[in-house]
């Protein structure tokens, strides 16, 4: 039986309509809609079906910092610098309900898996939980001592995780409203956090350019990635739990293979910081947004082949990796607080895999050529933009001359 290598991710579509940096993206349940928030104070709902007009929702008085579809896809929540949360019906009417949520910027909004409640995080240092349909404040979690950038429910709705500028990630029990554990290993502000689809792990991104993965049962640091050259602004787990995508101020997106504990792909698409990223509910697509005002939709491709099958063929039987939904302990990490380089992370405690030298050389050559191709395309895009600008200027000058010469 032959196993085919996963294909590279490909840029499927890109949407232009925002007038300032994109701050957040999220897919609806059926992947037919994609929502994005922006510093331009608007919320856009894009349709994946070609030639379908997007919805622009204007209601917030300041920058929209976060968006999240309800599990059913019938509602869409947004948070803003105007200190409010709005719950929208994502149709052409764009009707919304306003929650006077916080006393400072709302940084994050996330629905519980049952859709009955949602959690918000704010610069007022609090995390708040709300009833969706009764439109009522339920309770507040307030142990952070600086801005709270992000808060998420666990898949089963029992836990809440929050990330803060106080350099901690806190795990909360929703029922007791107590802080279960504080993770303090980040060396800078923690920008984003999310639960693994299994609910057994969390991943957090930081201004210290790192991504860290912890077990929420043992609170052990499982994986530590230092692959970006600037702050990591957002991350998203693939629904299978096998992959993680990150967005960074170094303008790249990176796909991490969590089963192997290594970098799979680096994607260059945005001109400037990549500010947000999210997988679709099926994992077939992921979307990214950036300070370049663009929303990009990528086809995953790499998840098409059954992951367990690939490993079974490529690896000796003794070193097969689990293809279950739980995140394996890929390799023992050094004690928390001590950094590790990318090279040591990839080489530490890994079984040797027999790969012919000729194949290795060929693959390295292909990777090098792809990097050259990526840079070439980027340069061509820049030149095309300059040409378009010059052509536009020529046309405008021609129109002015025509107007002056017309009696």
From Swiss-Prot:
Keyword Coiled coil annotated: yes
WD repeats: 17-56, 59-98, 101-140, 143-182, 185-224, 227-266, 269-308
Biased composition (Polar residues): 342-357
Gene3D superfamilies: YVTN repeat-like/Quinoprotein amine dehydrogenase
Matches recorded under InterPro entries: G-protein_beta_WD-40_rep (IPR020472), WD40/YVTN_repeat-like_dom_sf (IPR015943), WD40_repeat_CS (IPR019775), WD40_repeat_dom_sf (IPR036322), WD40_rpt (IPR001680), WDR55_POC1 (IPR050505)
Residues covered by region (Disordered): 317-357
SUPFAM superfamilies with a match to the protein in the record: WD40 repeat-like (SSF50978)
UniProt keyword Metal-binding present: no
Keywords assigned by UniProt, alphabetized: Cell projection, Cilium biogenesis/degradation, Coiled coil, Cytoplasm, Cytoskeleton, Repeat, WD repeat
Entry GO terms, CC: centriole; ciliary basal body; cytoplasm; spindle pole
Record PROSITE patterns: WD_REPEATS_1, WD_REPEATS_2, WD_REPEATS_REGION
Subcellular location: Cytoplasm, Cytoskeleton, Microtubule organizing center, Centrosome, Centriole; Cytoplasm, Cytoskeleton, Cilium basal body; Cytoplasm, Cytoskeleton, Spindle pole
Entry similarity comment: Belongs to the WD repeat POC1 family.
Self-association and partners: Interacts with POC1B.
Function: Plays an important role in centriole assembly and/or stability and ciliogenesis. Involved in early steps of centriole duplication, as well as in the later steps of centriole length control. Acts in concert with POC1B to ensure centriole integrity and proper mitotic spindle formation.
Protein name per Swiss-Prot or TrEMBL: POC1 centriolar protein homolog A
Organism: Bos taurus
